[in-house]
Amino acid sequence: MRVADFSFELPEALIAHYPQPQRSGCRLLSLDGPTGTLTHGIFTDLLDKLAPGDLLVFNNTRVIPARLFGRKASGGKLEVLVERVLDDHRVLAHVKASKAPKPGAELLLGDDENIRATMLARHDTLFELRFDDERDVFTILNAVGHMPLPPYIDRPDEDADRELYQTVYSQRPGAVAAPTAGLHFDEPMLAALQEKGIEMAFVTLHVGAGTFQPVRVDTIEDHIMHSEYAEVPQEVVDAVLACKARGKRVVAVGTTSVRSLESAAKAAENGLIAPFFGDTRIFIYPGYHYQVVDALVTNFHLPESTLIMLVSAFAGYKNTMNAYQQAVAEQYRFFSYGDAMFISRNPRAPQEKVSP
């Protein structure tokens, strides 16, 4: 399967640089997986598409202000993007500099360069840094860090992004990118869903910067997926099994919830799904047999990305690429701050051939 099969033309003007004034005010393109039928609407239409007893599974990770600017004590500007917090004082980070710092190098970070850190070791593309400060990592980042807006949002982060680039139900700090399908849910929408009898459960997947990395191979099967930490606790497993037992749908909010649930399904030796705590490298592309997820709420993804491959595996390749063509023609807003899709699973998708 070729990566180029997942390419599409996207006018620059359709990339959303700011969210809608109201979270649930975005547009919603619904795709019926079995038939390929498309319906245009607004996000609050989701209320009519869900039935009492359906289970919405959200990712409750919280984005940390993970981007720091500064310089090496020996000179030379650099940019640090924290990928993973290891403990109160150590992190794994991407470091962008004209010359990479060596072990033992001292870094002066923050807009005032008053945060000292030491480069301890290099692990492939990541640098292990220690903050030489009494405060813990999260306190430091909240004080001096910048929100790590995606590379396609071509503007500096603003104070408002600390709230806007965050789901209203986020609880567990650790992500460097938002689970963006969840950005559309506001408190009134969540209350309306509960009132209708929609069940809710929360997984955690700390989204890493790897989610924005382009696929650098020609053949999909050669791609090595980045690793992210996920948690699917027992209460989520119980909620999924209860939902299936009553004949209702498990609806994943975002591709990170999909990857968490399907990782937990892979971990189950007996039965449909088991608790999962650990790193996942699950890579879902056409041919994959979904085990847990029946429907999906998701944003519009980058051409040739692993995420459009995941959606194609769910809805079917032809359905997905047709939906994206229609979204461009109808001028939907794309990517993190853009519009949303609601997709029901296409049971024939795993057998479908991928051909443009």
Swiss-Prot record:
Pathway: tRNA modification; tRNA-queuosine biosynthesis
S-adenosyl-L-methionine recorded as keyword: yes
Entry keyword annotation includes S-adenosyl-L-methionine: yes
HAMAP family on file: QueA
Listed GO MF terms: S-adenosylmethionine:tRNA ribosyltransferase-isomerase activity
GO process terms (BP): queuosine biosynthetic process; tRNA wobble guanine modification
Function noted in UniProt: Transfers and isomerizes the ribose moiety from AdoMet to the 7-aminomethyl group of 7-deazaguanine (preQ1-tRNA) to give epoxyqueuosine (oQ-tRNA).
Subcellular location: Cytoplasm
Keywords, ordered alphabetically: Cytoplasm, Queuosine biosynthesis, S-adenosyl-L-methionine, Transferase
Subunit field text: Monomer.
Organism of derivation: Yersinia pseudotuberculosis serotype O:1b (strain IP 31758)
Top EC class for this record: transferase
Any one Gene Ontology cellular component term annotated for this protein: cytoplasm
Tree of life domain: Bacteria
NCBIfam families per the UniProt record, alphabetical: PRK00147.1, queA
Protein name (Swiss-Prot/TrEMBL): S-adenosylmethionine:tRNA ribosyltransferase-isomerase
Catalysed conversion reaction: 7-aminomethyl-7-carbaguanosine(34) in tRNA + S-adenosyl-L-methionine = epoxyqueuosine(34) in tRNA + adenine + L-methionine + 2 H(+)
Gene: queA
EC number(s) per entry: 2.4.99.17
Family according to the record: Belongs to the QueA family.
